[in-house]
C-alpha cells in the first residue's frame, strides 16, 4: 500500500500531511524529517482509542518526556472545562511554547486540543493524529479549532494550523461501519465541490472505499485533502472561497441541533441529509 505526503502552505504556517498505513509506528522518523524538536510532549488521547495503538505511539516518542491525558470525546466535553484541564497539565509541568501537544483521536478531540494549543502561551507546537475517517479527510487539515457554548456549536475557537498531521489508515480498521460512512459523507461532499472525475471514482469504488481497501481508501482521502489544501491556501480564514467547504452543513447543523447533538445522528450522517 502506498503512502502520500501533502505539503500545505498557508500564510500562518507550512506543514505536511502524511497519509498511509502503520504511520504511527514511524512517527519518530517523521518528526525528525520535519525538523520538529521538543523536550516535552502532552498526548491527549481519545478514550475510544484501542490500547494497542496507544502503546505503539508511546513507544515511538520515548526520546521525549511524555505526559498523557485521557479525553472522553463528546459534544458535552467540547467545553472550556476541557480546555482548562489540558492547560492545567501544561502549566503544572512547565511546558514552554517550544514543547508540543498531540491530539490522538477524532474530530472532537482535534478541535479541543487544537484550541488548547492555540491559547496556551499564545501558541504551542501541535501535532494532529486523527483516528476517524471524517477527521482524516476534513477537520485535521485547515486549522479550524474550537469548542461549544450554550449559544451553539463551535462558536468559540481559533484558526491555528498544526505543525504535522499523521493520517494512519490502520486506525480506521477498528471503527464501526457507521463511523466509516460518516467519513465517506465528507469525501462525497469534497467530490461534489471538486470534480466529476472524483465523483465518478467514488461511485465506481464505493464498496472498496467503505471496506478500506488498499490504495482506494488512500486515494479517496488524498483527493479530499488535496481539495482542502487548494482552498485553504487561497482562503485560510474563510473570508470567501473556503465557505464552499460548508456544502451540506447548513441543514446538517440544523438536524443535529434539533436532536440536541445526540448519538441518534452523527455529524457525517447529518451531512448526508444536508447534501
Task: Label the model's feature ranges.
Residues 108-114, 136, 254:
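Short glycine/serine/threonine-rich phosphate/pyrophosphate-binding segments
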Residues 74, 104-106, 247-248:
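Glycine-rich beta-strand-to-loop/alpha-helix junction loops that act as flexible
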